[in-house]
């Protein structure tokens, strides 16, 4: 559904509301039992619902040899995975069905281990041996272990922003003109998995991102009560660098 208006010869406006229900998307059918011992076959069973609203406004004018224009656009998007052939999951929160396209899944970080006593009282850590200052995760299913079955939907989509907006303006005078374009998005989750943020000082990477200079407080014994990033280490530490709420930001 759309509306297109033109007023006063200079002003234009367009509004659109759309709904898209895609079916028969080719995906891997992981519902097939693994007993077969082969890769799951692909089948046209995928289904996605998309909804959105778009609005654009424009103004143009002329005064003698001077021409100018301003165009603005804004869009709000939403999507839902109805079916994607995902295999059976032991817990409902592990299913990607019902979530947005590109929804990120990971562990929920709940702080840092304060000391060895804290580690001993916590659930079993399966990703690596942990030390004080390492990231502590929530045991979502209460089984006393931190593993892949504790991953939940975190943040928002990493692929499709909820909102897109832009501004295009320019002018022309006697054959000379300038156009300017500004674009932006919001409602998107970005993973901080670049080397100088995610794992600095490892594998020959001697740089630490300026991201740490903002409001980041590295865990140390003296700063354990106010720290918001884990201890620094040059050694491998799989626990600290799992996909989790520790390493995401709004995009």
List the model feature ranges, each with a label.
Residues 69, 158-186, 214, 221, ...:
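Conserved C-terminal beta-signal and adjacent last beta-strands/turns
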Residues 16-19, 150, 180-186:
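Active-site proximal loops enriched in glycine and acidic residues that flank catalytic Cys/His/Asp
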Residues 25, 147, 189-193:
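A short, polar/proline- and glycine-enriched secondary-structure boundary/capping micro-motif
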Residues 29-39, 141-150, 233-245:
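Flexible, solvent-exposed coil segments and beta strand-coil junctions
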Residues 1-104, 243-251:
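Extracellular/periplasmic, surface-exposed regions of secreted and cell-surface proteins
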Residues 103, 185-251:
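Extracytoplasmic gating/loop element in the C-terminal half of outer-membrane beta-barrel translocons
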Residues 8-10, 64, 176, 182, ...:
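Bacterial peptidoglycan biogenesis and beta-lactam-recognition machinery
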Residues 43-46, 62-159, 199, 209-212, ...:
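Conserved small-residue
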């Amino acid at each position: 559904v759309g509306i297109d208006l033109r007023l006063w010869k200079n002003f234009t406006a367009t509004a659109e509301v759309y709904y898209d229900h895609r079916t028969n998307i080719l995906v891997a059918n992981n519902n097939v039992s693994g007993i077969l011992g082969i890769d799951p076959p692909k089948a046209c069973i995928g289904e996605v619902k998309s909804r959105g609203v778009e609005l654009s406004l424009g103004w143009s004018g002329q005064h003698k040899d001077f021409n100018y224009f301003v165009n603005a656009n804004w869009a709000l998007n939403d999507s839902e995975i109805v079916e994607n052939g995902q295999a059976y999951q032991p817990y409902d929160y592990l299913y990607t069905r019902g979530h947005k396209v590109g929804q990120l899944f990971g562990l929920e970080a709940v702080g840092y281990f304060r000391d060895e006593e804290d580690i001993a009282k916590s659930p079993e850590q399966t990703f690596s041996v942990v030390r004080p200052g390492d990231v502590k995760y929530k045991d979502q299913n209460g089984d006393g272990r931190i593993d892949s079955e504790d991953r939940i939907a975190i943040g928002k989509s990493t692929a499709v922003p909820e909102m897109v907006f832009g501004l295009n303006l320019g002018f022309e005078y006697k054959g000379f003109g300038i156009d300017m374009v500004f674009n932006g998005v919001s409602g998107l989750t970005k993973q901080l998995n670049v080397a100088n943020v995610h794992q600095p000082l490892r594998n020959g990477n001697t740089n630490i991102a300026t991201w740490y200079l903002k409001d980041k407080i590295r865990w140390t014994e003296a700063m354990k009560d106010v720290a918001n990033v884990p201890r620094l280490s040059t050694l491998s530490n799989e626990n600290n660098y799992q996909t989790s709420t520790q390493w995401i930001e709004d995009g």
